[in-house]
């Protein structure tokens, strides 16, 4: 999701590639599709796919560590990622390297989607810019009846400090949602998914435990 995810943010945004009435404002082949409340949503075509890639850009009142803590707290994704249903931490490889399972609630008549994601976080020590890669891992968890498994998806975060306790977050997602999706459902996710996800993230990231979070390899 698109999802929006931490890729858990992720697939709550999966249908955003069909955003209607895109404005002709390009940014490295990205086209600005909408802008509300400081949340900018871009799309661009993907080769051999009817689904477009999506990029969301906005400023958040948070430190690097604060936003990283919120993204890594995958089991609370349903509190902020649009239509996120269930998220389970599978494995902690290191404090900045985890694997988790997520299920996205997709309205009838389409079936729910699920996926397994590997989140890896690094920081440039000079610029303090954080990079988060979150590709899907096919075959890591057995598929479930009645749920469509997403096996091809890559989510990326770039987080850069822009002031005291403020960061600029850029999230991109390329995904194959698998199977047919009704047009009305596509439009629902396209108009609401990215905006609702980042609206909620702005609030969610203010939890005290995230403000207090510290990581050995992350500088604010």
Task: Give names to the regions the model predicted.
Residues 25-220:
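Eukaryotic helix-grip
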Residues 1-6:
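Positively charged n-region of N-terminal signal peptides that target proteins for export
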Residues 8-20:
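Bacterial N-terminal signal peptides
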